[in-house]
Structures are given as structure tokens and as C-alpha cells.
A protein has these predicted regions:
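Pepsin/retropepsin-fold aspartyl endopeptidases
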Residues: 2-222
Length: 222
């Protein structure tokens, strides 16, 4: 039966390490661990690229989840296989990260990001700690009343939430985020001015990790 006539489904288990969803994938035949990050793109540490002999093919300009703009080398992964062997992504573009230091505490070699799942259905089950990846021949069975549509801007999973009355926020559905909701300064100031939120505490520091590494310490509000 042609692939287009049947739905292909892969079950990807994950475990939590330091609040991050960690998954296993085989890169060119070598199984490695990665942070499952819907807010980012596929990225490999330079260390892994060098070990597996994955050459740089291009460069790409990007802005990471911490707002840092940069230009990174781009590589092409010949094969990225799910642990159950059901789905093999081929010719996958990925960013080559300059430093692997921030990833060592998680025991991972990079990110599995949203660009890998373009035109696919991804379901996350927190009870069984599994990620269901399926091709989109069949529509999702979830009730439309429980759905929030994604923005049509690009491939990133951007949704609109309402905070208080009349305050619409465009937010990135980001499984790599350390919290339920992180606000941009402009959104925080807008909500505070409109009485839609209040500050409980204020601190100084940073613990967010993205393709640009660790975020620089700054004032944060809770």
C-alpha cells in the first residue's frame, strides 16, 4: 500500500530531566538523546557533528528563544530515525551549535525542534510520557471546541491566548520553556498597565537554555 494511503504512527517516549523533555533519536545510525523543543529548530552540538563527520553545508541566521540573534553553521542529517524504527526523517537541515557545555548537565546532544514535524500531527501525553507522531492523512479526532489554531506565520507553533479582558497575546508553544508562560517585557508592561496581572516577586538571574546557550542574567518578575 502506498505511504500516502495509510497513516504512519510512531510513539516516542520521553523522560524529564531538569524540567526538560528528553527523547532518544538515531542520528545516522547512532542513538543519542535530545531536548524535545517545539519552540526551536533541530540543532546538533558541534561535538556530535565532528564525531559523526557531518559537514557544514550552509549558514543560517536565527533568533533563539532568549532573543539572541546570530548566524550559525548549517548541516544536513542524512537519517534521523525514531526509536521504534517507524519514521526515518532524511535530509534534515540542522544548526551546528558552537558549544556543548550548556547541554552536558542534561546529557543531550542538541534539540529536536518543530521544523522536523512540519505537516505532521504531534500529540503529547503527559500521563504516559509519550509523544505520538503521525502523518496527516487523517484529521485529528480531538473536538474542535478544545482546539486553538496555530498562526499561519511560518512553521513555528504560535497561538493566541487571552489574558484578562481584551488582552490578546501571541505566544510560542514551547516545550523547552522552563515555565508555563513567559512574557516579553512589552506584554508584561501591557498587562500590568491594564490591571490584568500583578507582580508577586522580583528576582535576578537566568536559567533558560537555547541554541545560543544560556541566557544572560537579568531582572525577572513572577
Amino acid at each position: 500500500m502506498p505511504v500516502s494511503a495509510q497513516q504512519i504512527i510512531s510513539v516516542l517516549p520521553y523522560r524529564l530531566v531538569g524540567g526538560k523533555m528528553i527523547v532518544a533519536m538515531s542520528v545516522n545510525g547512532q542513538e543519542r538523546s535530545f531536548i524535545f523543543d517545539t519552540g526551536g529548530q533541530v540543532a546538533l552540538t558541534g561535538e556530535l557533528c565532528d564525531e559523526l563527520g557531518i559537514p557544514v553545508t550552509d549558514s543560517v541566521k536565527t533568533t533563539d528563544a532568549n532573543g539572541k540573534e546570530m548566524s550559525l553553521p548549517q548541516v544536513t542529517i542524512s537519517s534521523l530515525l525514531t526509536p521504534d524504527g517507524v519514521i526515518n526523517f532524511t535530509g534534515v537541515p540542522a544548526m551546528k551549535l558552537a558549544s556543548s557545555v550548556p547541554f552536558k548537565c542534561f546529557g543531550v546532544d542538541g534539540f529536536i525542534g518543530s521544523n522536523l514535524f512540519k505537516n505532521m500531527i504531534v500529540e503529547i501525553d503527559g500521563k504516559t510520557k509519550t509523544i505520538l507522531i503521525s502523518t496527516a492523512e487523517k484529521a485529528s479526532t480531538i473536538s474542535l471546541r478544545k482546539m486553538i489554531p496555530f498562526s499561519l506565520k511560518g512553521y513555528m507553533p504560535i497561538i493566541t491566548l487571552q489574558a484578562g479582558t481584551g488582552n490578546n497575546l501571541e505566544v510560542l508553544f514551547d516545550t523547552g520553556s522552563p515555565g508555563f508562560l513567559s512574557l516579553k517585557n512589552s506584554d508584561y508592561e501591557k498587562l500590568q498597565a491594564g490591571g490584568a496581572c500583578r507582580t508577586i516577586s522580583e528576582g535576578f538571574g537566568g536559567g533558560s537554555i537555547s541554541v545560543g546557550g544560556m541566557v544572560e542574567a537579568d531582572v525577572s518578575h513572577r
